[in-house]
UniProtKB/Swiss-Prot annotation:
It comes from Saccharopolyspora erythraea (strain ATCC 11635 / DSM 40517 / JCM 4748 / NBRC 13426 / NCIMB 8594 / NRRL 2338). InterPro entries: Isoprenoid_synthase_dom_sf, MIB_synthase, Terpene_cyclase-like_2. Residues 1-29 are annotated as: Disordered. This is 2-methylisoborneol synthase. The lineage of its organism: Bacteria, Bacillati, Actinomycetota, Actinomycetes, Pseudonocardiales. Mg(2+) binds at residues 113-114, 118, 264, 268, 272. GO terms for molecular function: metal ion binding; terpene synthase activity. Catalyzes the cyclization of 2-methylgeranyl diphosphate (2-MeGPP) to 2-methylisoborneol (2-MIB), which likely involves the intermediacy of 2-methyllinalyl diphosphate.
Length: 354
């Protein structure tokens, strides 16, 4: 049985309104005010600081070999602390090599976002390069099959670009610790992630926020699914492809994916508003649509999360009883572990603090 407990969560308190969209003005950092709300989630797994530090060390050495080892990049890795996130989200994994492969994928995906998307979000509204660049990034893990001369040209382009090379090499490590079916699963999920990135960029170019239902539909794609879907590979087993593809299992995976991504929205709410002209997170979207203050929208976002996680509890129970299989039980437990670790990491990481 899954134990859902209430986690007291600080609510950002809105300061005097300064933005063009209600609910997107400056706010005090979460934790400053006295108001809290409750998020329901399993309790966090134990910390493994020594393992996390070793994963981070290996990832930094790898980055330096790619030409991504500048002082700011290395500092960013230690602030992001992917090793801690992986050990929290995959408490069943004891294999540092497997967890390091996941750490490299996280850093590579973050590099794509930072280099191709976050930078562009600060450029002029006529910049249309994100879509083509994301397609290029996907080809680094899903190689084109070209004529020999063109293939050589593409290979050189990929290897000369540190972000594309990071994608390619990180995915190569992932292929070594997973089955072909597991690797293809993640390859597909990353393409879906880039579709979500591109949609978000479209809203930014329009300088508008989507309605809540459309935002959440996009968040289903612009999500942590590529990371969450490594749960069996990192634990050293494989959920059979036909079982993974079963509608009941896909339903559980999709629900867990959206919930995990909302932790990012909630924990990074204040930072996003501070750093971006147009914040793109669930509280901001709710505030704009319902014309309410950010703190009220934050509480409403937590209520949506709680509805979703209770529905996931029912869905995983139904899948486990309808498809009785030891590997599936292990996989569903892994989804819940990922949520517990992700919630804890997001609300305690230095990445989301000022």
């Amino acid at each position: 049985m899954i134990e859902l407990i209430g986690h007291e969560t600080p609510v950002p308190s809105q300061q005097q309104h300064t933005g063009g969209v209600r609910g997107t003005s400056a706010c005090t950092p979460p934790g400053v005010g006295e108001r809290t709300t409750v998020l329901y989630c399993p309790p966090p797994p134990p910390e493994r600081p020594e393992v996390a530090a070793e994963i981070n060390r290996r990832v930094v050495v790898w980055m330096q070999g790619l030409g991504l080892g500048g002082e700011d990049n290395v500092a960013g890795v230690y602030k992001h602390d992917p090793g801690r996130g992986i050990t929290l989200c995959h408490p069943g994994s004891q294999d540092v090599e497997r967890m390091t492969a996941a750490g490299k994928m996280i850093v590579a995906e973050t590099a794509v976002d930072d280099y191709f998307c976050e930078t562009n979000s600060r450029r002029d509204a006529n910049d249309q390069t994100i879509g083509p660049n994301l397609s290029l990034a996907q080809s680094a893990i899903d190689a084109p099959r070209l004529t020999p001369d063109l293939q050589a040209l593409w290979n050189k382009c990929r290897d000369d670009h540190p972000v594309l090379r990071a994608q390619h090499e990180a995915f190569g490590d992932l292929e070594r610790i997973s089955s072909p079916a597991q690797a293809q699963r993640v390859r597909h999920d990353i393409a879906q992630l880039y579709l979500g990135y591109n949609a978000e960029n479209g809203w930014r170019l329009l300088n508008r926020l989507p309605p809540v239902w459309q935002y959440l539909a996009n968040r289903q794609m612009n999500s942590f699914r590529p990371c969450l879907n490594l749960t069996d590979a990192l634990d050293g087993y494989e959920l059979a492809p036909q079982l993974y593809a079963h509608p009941l299992v896909q339903d559980c995976t999709a629900r867990a994916t959206l919930i995990a991504t909302l932790y990012n929205d909630l924990a990074s709410c204040e930072r996003e508003i501070r750093e971006h002209g147009l914040p793109f997170n669930l509280p901001a979207v709710i505030a704009a649509e319902e014309r309410i203050a950010l703190d009220e929208a934050f509480v409403r976002a937590c209520e949506i999360h709680n509805e979703l996680i209770q529905a996931l509890e029912e869905a995983t129970g139904h899948a486990a009883s309808a498809l009785a299989d030891p590997a599936l039980s292990r996989y569903l437990t892994g989804l819940w572990s990922w949520l517990a670790g992700s919630r804890h990491w997001h609300f305690t990481t230095a990445r989301h603090r000022a």
